[in-house]
Amino acid sequence: MAWQVSLLELEDRLQCPICLEVFKESLMLQCGHSYCKGCLVSLSYHLDTKVRCPMCWQVVDGSSSLPNVSLAWVIEALRLPGDPEPKVCVHHRNPLSLFCEKDQELICGLCGLLGSHQHHPVTPVSTVCSRMKEELAALFSELKQEQKKVDELIAKLVKNRTRIVNESDVFSWVIRREFQELRHPVDEEKARCLEGIGGHTRGLVASLDMQLEQAQGTRERLAQAECVLEQFGNEDHHEFIWKFHSMASR
């Protein structure tokens, strides 16, 4: 018999209908549907009474639920060595598989089904992570554009500073030559003019130096922000969403 089911499709079929994560301690109800043991306990508080199946709504005896050994064996066989344990909800101890769009926080399937996030718009963590990474890419692009603008500003300031200094040198040389011809009768006037040009030049250069220093500081901060954004992209889904949401809210 040929098998044509991809690993991703198989993983989708091995998910608990309640928490939307791969089965953990799966139990099979009398109706044939399987759920995580923790999900069933959270749904009915205990398994010694009648349980209504969330899939077919058939009322079955919870105490007759047996471990789905075959399903557990398949999941264990497909599990990659070294897979990290998923982060779990502090209320239901189920994997944080969903993101509440209204409250902007990670939740488990039971939080969205029965808890305080009931009826809130929710999105799978993988989808939210992809969306936020797209936002991160857009932010990264904007950062690059800002860096380009700052680089252009720095180049312009450096060019203007060089031009002003060079022009000042030329003007000073011309003035010295002219006043050398007049010698003593105009020495006082020459000194006054030179001082005026020097003072004006120092003022312009000081202003440009200040702008240059500010622009270089802005460039350094943008470079630091770029590094932070690149590090965010390497975080796991949950750390990335927590940190990205914390950064975006500031």
From Swiss-Prot:
UniProt-listed PROSITE patterns: ZF_BBOX, ZF_RING_1, ZF_RING_2
Q: Which gene encodes it?
A: TRIM73
Q: Which UniProt keywords apply?
A: Coiled coil, Metal-binding, Zinc, Zinc-finger
Q: Where are the zinc fingers (B box-type)?
A: 84-125
Q: Which GO terms describe its biological process?
A: innate immune response
Give the RING-type zinc finger regions. Answer: 16-57
* Amino-acid positions noted as binding Zn(2+) in the UniProt annotation, renumbered to this chain: 89, 92, 111, 117
Q: What is the lineage of its organism?
A: Eukaryota, Metazoa, Chordata, Craniata, Vertebrata
Keyword Coiled coil assigned to the entry: answer is yes
* Positions in coiled-coil regions: 125-169, 204-235
Q: Which GO terms describe its molecular function?
A: ubiquitin protein ligase activity; zinc ion binding
Q: Does the keyword Metal-binding apply?
A: yes
| Entry GO CC | cytoplasm; cytosol
Q: Which family does it belong to?
A: Belongs to the TRIM/RBCC family.
Q: Which SUPFAM superfamilies match?
A: B-box zinc-binding domain (SSF57845), RING/U-box (SSF57850)
The UniProt entry, under Pfam families, shows: zf-B_box (PF00643), zf-RING_UBOX (PF13445)
- According to UniProt, the name of this protein is Tripartite motif-containing protein 73
